[in-house]
Amino acid sequence: MAQLMNKAKNFVAEKVANVEKPKASVEDVDLKDVGRHGITYLTRICVENPYSASIPVGEIKYTLKSAGRVIVSGNIPDPGSLKGNDKTMLEPAIKVPHSALVSLIKDIGADMDIDYVLELGLVVDLPVIGNFTIPLSHKGEMKLPGLSDIF
């Protein structure tokens, strides 16, 4: 009886592991807004849903790092859902306080940019499987706004 149960568990685990899952990629990270409290960057994430039904996105977890240090991290609850058999563009905004950027002053240099790594976890609710996190990572260079951008 125990062998039969183990075979059944292995069969189900194998089928679940081979279920097609949504695919995602970071398309772009751009400066969106400069305010008194910080800078807002707009992240564009393209997600492809292989299912005919729409899939809800529970949250987007993010961590923005530079020079091996975390600049900002957080989560964006309920950013929407993924259209069935289609690509959906999600555009979460990431707010970075000025104080976090000041701590990176030695990395900025003369060209006013920061090398960064953006780590994202896109949490989708798949039928039968439950919550599934799609891990994403994007490396790039952030241009900091000049005084003319602020005033």
Curated annotation (Swiss-Prot):
Q: Which SUPFAM superfamilies match?
A: LEA14-like
Chain segments annotated as transmembrane:
none
For the keyword Acetylation, the answer is no
Give any single GO term for biological process. cellular response to salt
- Pfam families cross-referenced by the UniProt entry: LEA_2 (PF03168)
Instruction: Describe what upregulates or represses it.
Output: By desiccation (leaves) and by abscisic acid (ABA) (leaves and callus).
Q: Which protein are we looking at? A: Desiccation-related protein PCC27-45
Q: Where is the signal peptide?
A: none
Q: Does the keyword NAD apply?
A: no
The family annotation for this protein states:
Belongs to the LEA type 2 family.
Keywords in alphabetical order, please.
Stress response
Which PANTHER family does the record cross-reference, listed alphabetically? Answer: DESICCATION-RELATED PROTEIN LEA14-RELATED (PTHR31459:SF19), PTHR31459
